[in-house]
Amino acid sequence: MATYAILGSTGNCGSAIIQNLLKSPNNKVHAYCRNQTKLQRLIPEVVDNKNVQIFQGSIYDVELLADCVRGTKAVFLVVTTNDNVPGCRVSRDCATSVIQALQKIKAEASPGLKLPKLVLLSSATIDDHLARHMPGWFRPIMLAAASHVYEDLRLTEVFLRSHADWVSSIFIKPAGLSVDVSRGHKLTLDEEESFISYLDLSAGMIEAAADDESRYDGRNVGVELSSRGELRCVLSWD
């Protein structure tokens, strides 16, 4: 049985990850959130579920974070914000606290302890390779509209990569996201999909985290629809 920690459990992506994980009885969930009541309202399946442990607290509570991520296979960093304000550092603060928690766990453990992978929700918009097919007029608009949020993500990636010698990270980079049904997904290192649902995105994140061959460690990973033509006929960049 594999255990996964989700930081940002009440957000669209975090709740979708939990819903997908709970489809299998072989998964255990450590759900980290600021408001347990809100989480239970959003995802009733977590109530009295023996495969779910809820941790209520701040992303700055390193002790509680250590309890949450200890013994897990992967940690999903999906704490996000839509507020594009100067000095935004929601993602960096979360990543910093997680690294501090892992340092604490490592210091207290016996040699050879296997630490969890970190799976960061980032964006294809800040990736020159994945975003290379975006229209030349569109990407600058997106970068300007969420400039501080994107800078926070960019610096978070730099920070996590600086710890790559002892902690593996995967950088998940979708394009547009929507609240929609699951339509099937596939992982890619070369493309981005114009729009994909949170359910499909989260399924892709779980697949990358569960990969025992470590093919996605340290990589920028896109998640696209398994049948690419379904939405592109309606939501084309052209």
UniProtKB/Swiss-Prot annotation:
Entry keyword set: Monooxygenase, Oxidoreductase
Protein's pathway: Secondary metabolite biosynthesis
Enzyme nomenclature, EC number: 1.-.-.-
Keyword Transcription: no
SUPFAM superfamilies: NAD(P)-binding Rossmann-fold domains
Signal peptide: none
EC class (word): oxidoreductase
Domain of life the protein comes from: Eukaryota
4Fe-4S keyword on record: no
Alphabetical list of InterPro entries matching this protein: NAD(P)-bd_dom, NAD(P)-bd_dom_sf
GO MF annotation: an example: monooxygenase activity
UniProt function note: Oxidoreductase; part of the gene cluster that mediates the biosynthesis of the dimeric xanthones cryptosporioptides. The pathway begins with the synthesis of atrochrysone thioester by the polyketide synthase dmx-nrPKS. The atrochrysone carboxyl ACP thioesterase dmxR1 then breaks the thioester bond and releases the atrochrysone carboxylic acid from dmx-nrPKS. Atrochrysone carboxylic acid is decarboxylated by the decarboxylase dmxR15, and oxidized by the anthrone oxygenase dmxR16 to yield emodin. Emodin is then reduced to emodin hydroquinone by the oxidoreductase dmxR7.
Protein family according to the UniProt entry: Belongs to the avfA family.
Full protein name: Oxidoreductase dmxR7
Organism lineage: Eukaryota, Fungi, Dikarya, Ascomycota, Pezizomycotina
